Amino acid sequence: MAESDGVEFFANRAQSSMADNKNSVLRCTFSAPSHSSTLLRGLSALRDQGQLLDVVLAIDNERFEVHKAVLASCSDYFRAMFTGGMKESNQNTIELIGLSARGLKHIIDFAYSSEVTLDLDCIQDVLGAAVFLQMVPVVELCEEFLKSAMSVETCLNIGQMATTFSLSSLKQSVDAYTFRHFLQIAQEDDFLHIPMERLTFFLQSNKLKNCSEIDLFHAAIRWLQHDASRRTVASEVLCHVRFPLMRSSELVDSVQIVDIMVEDVQCRHFLLEAFNYQILPFRQHEMQSPRTSIRSDITSLITFGGTPYTDNDRTVSSKVYFLPDITVRQFKELTEMEMGCSHACVSVLDNFVYVVGGQHLQYRSGEGAVDICFRYDPHLNQWLRIQPMQESRIQFQLNVLDGQLYATGGRNRSGSLSSVECYCPKKNEWTNVDSLKRRIWGHAGATCGDKLYISGGYGVSVEDKKTLHCYDSALDQWDFKCPMNEPRVLHAMISANNRIYALGGRMDHVDRCFDVLAVEYYIPETDQWTTVSPMRAGQSEAGCCLLDKKIYIVGGYNWHLNNVTSIVQVYNTETDEWERDLHFPESFAGIACTPIILPQTTTQR
């Protein structure tokens, strides 16, 4: 009997356990997708039928009967009012101030329907009520509507709403739209009433699109002349117009005839500054100010010259190409130089490009080296011939250090050079400084901090192709630093992130030349070289520059193919990766390139 009872006990336990497991397996959660909308319709019906209403909101002689629970569930303002122990929680009628009846009606309708109907007539009332009552979804819908309603006619009013209600996302959209359409907006009557701070915000920006300085001047004058009391702030407004970048005829015919430009002392100074800037081109470097900066926020890659290295033609290119910005994968022709060149060196000082030396006819040796120097003004698209170097140079280096240009080494018909020349823009003259410790050509150079570094090239011995020289302008002295790991000639150097990268080039072995694919960087503080990802294809005698933390190597000669190339390899200094999906319009060696800020009208054409 006892054994039978035990069997029955365990059988019951097992059956119970199976039932529990079965119930556990079958336990599921279901949802009705339409429940939310059904609930809202039900609450709206109760409101329409006047059932279970428990509070009245009074505003502007209008009364709205509602359910506390509905408003508290979707508004932080009402939740705090009805549940936070405030006196209104026990009142049957609550007087509201700080918003309009029309705005409140839209908010209540949204609470019961999740929908809001907006137009330009009611938007300010609805947005004001939504912000006041902390109805975030309605605020977001209002922002969405206002962004879609943006136009030349509405932009300024929408901007005022964005400022009033501290809507940063909407303000950014308004600013972006205004930058694109500023001149059209400036013709609107609303423009005459914008605050001065708002006007100067736009006038000082580099983001304005398709705006000439003379057009911006006319817009500013229109705003100033609308109210006579504004004359006292004329200089605070007009200081953001870049008079030095206007044409001389515009200054004479359109600017100096405006009375305020003559009567206001500071405005008269702006006019004088512009005239001085234009008649003294060699002193423009010392007159730099925000008014002399090109109005653009995009840095472009710009190239000069090059040679196809054809045996039957000594022609070199006079074309200047540019890559509008890093998102555009195609070079465009910008202008032409006064004469063709290859293997020239370029450097940028105050956004002027100096194109120095090189050759105007193709020679494989230094026989074609020239001493001619030009300065290119990208704003006016003008060339200015400056004082020539003391020696003709090709396959040398040109770098900016302490506001001056340094031309180092190279070769000419007399042979290789050790001399170093320094150009002073203010004096427009070249002077000799401490020479390199040996003759050298085909080297590379870069500045980092307050020092100039020269690496590799053809010197006296094989070891010279690995040598690193460092120049201290304060001491006017050259010193040797840690040599590179790889011997290189006709390579490139670029300074980025406090590192100096050595890239590409070639090395010689008996009667053959080989591409150097290895890439390494030098850290001045530690005097050490570190190897990074190699190039995918060889490039020597190539253009090289840094743009947006990426190193661009343009064209050059590939010794594996034994020919010039159009390839553009791009090295990301942050990820240590290479890209190769870009090509120069022509297969050239001896291209010079540099990053520069071009006018908006140039990059957008």
Curated annotation (Swiss-Prot):
According to the lineage, what is the superkingdom?
A: Eukaryota
The parts of the chain that form a coiled coil are none
Tell me where the Kelch repeats sit in this chain.
300-351, 352-403, 404-450, 452-498, 499-549, 551-598
Carries keyword Cell membrane?
no
Q: Which UniProt keywords apply?
A: Kelch repeat, Repeat
- Record-annotated BTB domain positions: 53-120
Q: Does the keyword Repeat apply?
A: yes
Domain called BACK: residue spans: 155-256
Q: Which Pfam families match?
A: BACK, BTB, Kelch_1, Kelch_6, Kelch_KLHDC2_KLHL20_DRC7
> Its biological function?
May play a role in endo(sarco)plasmic reticulum (ER/SR) mitochondrial signaling. May be part of the ubiquitin-proteasome system (UPS) and affect ubiquitination and degradation of target substrates.
Q: By what name is this protein known?
A: Kelch-like protein 26
Record the organism.
Danio rerio (Zebrafish)
